[in-house]
Regions:
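Signature of the first transmembrane helix
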Residues: 1-56, 85-89, 120, 155, ...
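Membrane-interface helix-loop junctions in multi-pass transport and translocation proteins
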Residues: 18-20, 24-25, 138-141, 149-185, ...
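Helix-loop junctions and terminal segments of transmembrane helices
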Residues: 44-60, 136, 195-196, 252, ...
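Membrane-proximal transmembrane or re-entrant/amphipathic helices at the cytosolic face
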Residues: 414-416, 435-493
Length: 493
């Protein structure tokens, strides 16, 4: 329920923001301020790396070691934030002011957006150890509260800029930054009050430091490369098509992110258990968690995405007063990409648990960087942004293959064949059958609203039934039956 409330607020906020900024300014914000979204992805990945070592020390019940681990990680991330600021204020600032296709009269506003994004991102990087501590203690409820609070605050600033007499783009970027800072402050206060190991000490764990630096370095390589790919596609679109298509990308990316967040809770819940499985050398349980987590994540994406993909034009029309050119088709492609991306997080979590992340990050990093050049050539030859996003979808499939290879290299008991056949192909076939049935149903009903409800009901029913009998294993089926019976029994009391 919390996710639906947060998503509903976020969708309505996007409508108000687009109305207040206009398509062109919204495109500028997505292009220049997009660094915030990508940096959030980067800090989430760094958080996973830091969580590994904190979870290890918590498992050993060594308070002093946990405190040294936290303080060492915090110092590393402060250094990374400083490095980020240096690069952003030199190379990044030059690129924004000389290379991007932005109207001269909006360049001042673009710089305000850029500087606000730098502040939010730098503080977000230093926040990583605190979020890792919350995750390692499995206090997921605090994330839920903050997510809803953040959504409400963003809705408030959307209305503020709608009726403000000031420059809407500048005001929006500043207020968005203020919200980010407030959330960071809240998390830190929460950690200081609940986890005594979060109190910083000026002691570097010299045994842990090289391990953390090495681990964070490889993580940084892979995720900086992914960030370069995501923002690179946005920049390429800007160079060829201008800020109007950037607005479409911004809308599509926001929908993609909001729907993908549904599996975030699944990934977060499985992560500590997978790491603990590796620590205890319980590889059978670890492999089971990777498999069942991948199934639940991908099935969840199908349940949400199929009706939206089929009725995207209708839903966009209800949502936005003005639909940016290209937003519908880009959004449909990105939602399909979400499905294939849903397999990757837990596979990478397992690789992270082993500590040997070098191969996965080197090869994925090379793939992502190479993909930027290929994307440029595709757009240059075809003069179509659609093919760029289709190719971007393919990179997710390649990355999944690299992660599976890397995991098999570290854990020989993990069966790539079983995972591909019984998880990826099984759920993909389930998705194709459900999508085909829903698409055929949509053709039979003329009314948009009734066809949306019909395909939602049919696809959901079909996915649940087929998943239960043909995708999930007997243990998972028994667990679900037990939970349903328990819920029904409780409901009749």
């Amino acid at each position: 329920m919390r996710m639906f409330i947060s998503m509903a607020i976020s969708f309505y906020t996007s409508r108000i923001v687009l109305q207040a900024l206009g398509v062109s300014d919204y495109g500028i914000y997505n292009l220049v301020g997009g660094i915030v979204v990508l940096a959030n992805m980067l800090t989430s990945s760094l958080s996973g790396a830091t969580s590994r070592y904190i979870t290890y020390s918590l498992g050993e019940k060594d308070f002093e070691k946990t405190r040294r681990t936290f303080s060492t990680a915090l110092m590393i991330h402060v250094g990374l934030a400083g490095l980020f600021i240096f690069v952003a204020e030199t190379v990044g600032l030059w690129f924004v002011n000389t290379q991007l296709v932005i109207s001269p009269d909006r360049m001042l506003a673009a710089n305000w957006v850029y500087q606000s994004a730098i502040i939010s991102t730098a503080l977000g990087i230093t926040q990583v150890p605190y979020n890792s501590l919350i995750t390692s203690h499995e206090r997921f409820g605090v994330f839920a509260v903050i997510e809803i609070l953040s959504s409400c605050l963003k809705l408030i600033i959307a209305f503020i800029i709608l009726y403000s007499m000031l420059d809407h783009l500048i005001l929006y970027s500043i207020l968005y930054m203020v919200i980010s800072v407030c959330i960071i402050v809240f998390y830190r206060i929460y950690c200081l009050r609940n986890f005594s190991e979060s109190r910083f000490i000026r002691i570097l764990d010299r045994d842990l430091l090289p391990k953390l630096l090495k681990f964070s370095g490889w993580t940084l390589l892979g995720n900086v490369s992914l960030t370069v790919l995501q923002q690179g596609v946005n920049i390429i679109v800007n160079l060829f098509f201008g800020t109007i298509i950037n607005a479409a990308v911004g809308i599509a990316t926001q929908v993609q992110g909001m729907l993908y967040s549904f599996i975030g809770n699944i990934t977060t819940a499985f992560t500590p258990q997978i790491i603990k499985g590796y620590v205890e050398s319980d590889y059978k349980r670890m492999n089971y968690l990777i498999t069942i987590g991948g199934k639940f994540s991908s099935i969840c994406i199908l349940l949400i995405s199929i009706p939206i993909i089929i009725k995207m034009d209708f839903l966009m029309g209800l949502w936005l007063k003005e639909i940016p050119t290209g937003a519908i088709v880009i959004c449909q492609i990105l939602l399909i990409k979400n499905f294939f991306n849903s397999f990757n997080p837990l596979i990478y979590t397992a690789i992270t648990a082993t500590g040997n992340i070098k191969n996965a990050n080197i090869f994925c990093g090379l793939e992502y960087l190479l993909s930027v050049g290929i994307t440029y050539l595709i757009v240059f030859w075809t003069h179509s942004y659609i093919y760029a996003f289709i190719f971007n979808l393919i990179t997710s499939l390649i990355a999944c293959g690299i992660y599976l290879w890397a995991l098999k290299h570290e854990i020989s008991s993990f069966s790539v064949y079983d995972y591909v056949v019984h998880t990826i192909l099984a759920v993909t076939l389930l998705g194709c059958v459900s999508f085909g049935t829903a698409f055929f149903t949509e053709r039979l009903i003329q009314s948009d609203i009734w066809s949306f409800f019909a395909i939602s009901f049919i696809s959901t029913t079909l996915i649940i039934i087929l998943s239960f009998y043909f995708v999930l294993d007997s243990n998972s089926r028994s667990f679900i039956v037990l939970k349903v019976n328990s819920y029904l029994h409780y409901g009749h009391k």
